[in-house]
Amino acid sequence: MGKPRGRKLLKKHHTEGEEASHVEPQPYDTNDTIPEKISSGSNGEPNTFFGVLDTQELEYFKQAESTLAVDTFENAEEKEQFISSVIEETKNKELKLATSQICSKLMERIILAGSNQQLKAIFRSFNGFFYGLACQKYSSHVLETLFVRGAAMVEKELLTPSFDEPGATEDGDDVYSPMEDLFLYMLNEITPSVRGMISHKYASHVFRLLILILSSKTLPSTTMSNSALRSKRSKIARKMIDLKDNEDFDKTYKTPDSFKVKLREILSSLYKELTGGVDLGSSNFKNISVTSMMKVRELCIDPVASPVLQLIIQVEGIFDRDRSFWHLIFSSSEEKNAKEEAFVEYLLSDPVGSHFLENVISFTRAKYTERLYKMYMRDRILKLSKRDLTGAFVVQALLKHLRQNDVKSILNDIVPELSLIVNSNMEFCISILDASIQHGDYLKEEIVLQLIKKFYPEGLEDRNILESCLSLNSSTLGNTRDDWPTAEERRRSLFLEKLIDYDDRFLNITIESLLALPEERLLQMCYHGVFSHVVEHVLQVKRVDKIKRKRLLNVFCTDIVNLSCNAYGSHLVDKLWDFTAQLPMYKERIATSMAGDSEKVKNSVYGRQAWKNWSMDKFLRKQFDWKRLIREQQQELFPDATPLQPGGDAGTKRKGDKPSYNRPEKKFRR
C-alpha cells in the first residue's frame, strides 16, 4: 500500500528519475488570483500555486464548513438553499478552496450534498488543472469525492436518457455537456501525465480510483478498514473529521463503452512509456528490453507504485487478452531465468513485494500462477510458510487459487509442522483449515491431532484451550479500566471459533475448558466484547450433549437478567432460546428470571430485544401459546425425537415409566 498521508512530507523519491509530463492549463477567469502556469518542479511534480484566501473569506468558509458538518437544518430545502449560497461564494475560488487544509473539507461536503448541475459546474471549474490538483495533498481527496459522485451520475445518464437534460447554473449558464464528456475531457488532460501519477504519493490514489471507474469495479468506501484506495492514516483522519460517504460509495457502476476504450488508451500510453515505445500485444514481447523490465520490477516493490500495478494487472484482461503488463514483469518462458528467480525471491522476502505477489496471483490466469509456483516456490513451501510477514501470505494465496493436486502437495509439506507454524501465524492456520475443508477434509485427522497437541496437550493437569489459545490471563478480560479488546484478542477468538466449527473435538475441549473456569471468570467472558463470541459459538444445541448443556446453563442462569441487559450478553441470551431445546425446566427458569425483574429488562435497549426474542409477553399472558412455541421449536430442531412430555425433559420413554397425566394449567389472575 502507499505511504500514509502525513503532515511532514518527505521529498519525493523517483525510482527511475524520469520527469512526469504535464498539461498546459486553460485560462481561468477569476478576479482574485490567477493560478501560475503548471510547471515541473525540481523533482518532476507540478509546481502550481492557486493563491490563498484572505482572512475574511477564510473565516466565512470555515463557518460554512462547520454548519454543514453539524447539519442542523430544519428541512432539505433549507439545506439546499444554504449550499447554493455557499457555492455562489466559491465562484472563481474553487482551486484555492480545494488546496486548502480546512476548506477542502468544505468542497467535499458541497460535492457530496450538491445537485447534479452544481456537481458539473465544479467539475468544469477544475478543467486544465486536474493533474496539479491530483498531486496536492488536500485537493487529491476532493478529486476522489468528485469522481465517485461523477461516476454515479454517468450511470444515471446512461440508464435514463432524459436524465442528461441541460440545466441552468446559478450564474445563468446552461450546462449542456453530459458527465461522460466531462470525464473524457479530464482523462484526455491527464493521459500524458499517468507515468508520473503512478509513483506520486497523492496522485497515485486518484489514478487508482479512475482505473476502478473506467473498468466498472466497485468503488471503495473512504472509511472502511479494508478499503482498496486510501491509506490507513487517511481513513482514520476521515473518521475523525466526521466526513461521511454518501450512498454513491462502495458500489459498482455501469459505464459507457467509451470508458473501456479510454482505459485501453491510457494504459497503452503508460505501457509505451514504460517500455520505450513498445505496443501492447504478445507479438511485441520480444522487443521489450531487459532495462525496461528491470525498471518496472523496481516499481513493483515501490510502496506507492506497487498498488497501482496490482490494479492494472487485475483489469488488463478487459482490453488485452495477452496480459501485456503481466509479461512486462514476469517471463513467459518455461525455463528458469536467473534474473526472474532473483526477483521472485526478493518479492517473497519483502513486505511490499510479497503483498504485490499475493494480489497479482489472485487476479491473473491459473496457468501463470502455476508457472511461478512450480518453478520458484514448490520445492521450498515449508520455508516460505515460516516467513510470517512475507512469504506466508503468498502461500495463503496459492492455497486458494492453485489446482487440487498442487494444494494437496502444499498441505502435505505444511501440516506435519502445523503445531510450530500456528505459534506465530494463526491467520495462516485458518487458510490451511479452509483448504482442507475445500478439498474434502484432506488430512483432517492429522491437522486436528497437531492442533490438539499444541493447545490441549495430554499429560498436563491444568490444560485449558482458553488459556493456550486466547491467553486469558494476559488479556483485557476482567479489567476495570474499560479497555477496548485488542486486535490480537480478536484474531485469537476468530481462530478458536474456526477450530470449533472444524471438528467436534475442539467444541468439546472448549466446553470443558469453560466449565473448568471459576464461575465468575466464565461470566466475565460473557460480558467481554470479543470473548463473548467464543462463548456464544459453543451454544450449538445439535452438537452438545444434554449433560454439558445443563452444566453451562447452571452458570448462565445465575445472572440471566444482567446478561439480558448487556450489549454482548443479550446475544448470548438470544442463543439460549435454542440451546434450551428439550430442556423445558431451564427454559422456564430463564423466562421466570426475566419476568421477575421485568422492569429492569424492559428499560434496557438490549433487554427489550431479549424479551421479544423469548416471547415473554406470551409467557406471562398466554402460557399455552408459549409452550406451543417450545414444542414447535423442538420438532424443528429434533424431528426424530420423542414429543415433549408435560412435566419433564423430552427423550426416549423407558420401560417401567409411570404414565404422566396432564394437569390443568394455572391461569394468571388479572
UniProtKB/Swiss-Prot annotation:
Subcellular compartments: Nucleus, Nucleolus
Compositionally skewed regions (Basic and acidic residues) per UniProt: 651-670
Pumilio repeats: 89-124, 125-160, 189-225, 289-331, 339-374, 376-412, 517-554, 555-592
UniProt-listed Gene3D superfamilies: Leucine-rich Repeat Variant (1.25.10.10)
Keyword Ion transport: no
InterPro entries the record matches: ARM-like (IPR011989), ARM-type_fold (IPR016024), NOP9 (IPR040000), Pumilio_RNA-bd_rpt (IPR001313)
GO function term, MF aspect, one: RNA binding
Bias kind Polar residues: ranges: 28-46
GO cellular component: 90S preribosome; nucleolus; preribosome, small subunit precursor
Keywords for the protein's UniProt record, in alphabetical order: Nucleus, Repeat, Ribosome biogenesis, rRNA processing
Presence of the UniProt keyword Repeat in the record: yes
Main localization (coarse): nucleus
SUPFAM superfamilies according to UniProt: ARM repeat
Biased composition annotated in UniProt, kind: Basic residues: 1-14
Renumbered residue ranges of the record's region Disordered: 1-46, 637-670
Protein's GO biological process: endonucleolytic cleavage in 5'-ETS of tricistronic rRNA transcript (SSU-rRNA, 5.8S rRNA, LSU-rRNA); endonucleolytic cleavage in ITS1 to separate SSU-rRNA from 5.8S rRNA and LSU-rRNA from tricistronic rRNA transcript (SSU-rRNA, 5.8S rRNA, LSU-rRNA); endonucleolytic cleavage to generate mature 5'-end of SSU-rRNA from (SSU-rRNA, 5.8S rRNA, LSU-rRNA); ribosomal small subunit export from nucleus
Cited function: RNA-binding nucleolar protein required for pre-rRNA processing. Involved in production of 18S rRNA and assembly of small ribosomal subunit.
Family, per entry: Belongs to the NOP9 family.
UniProt name for this protein: Nucleolar protein 9
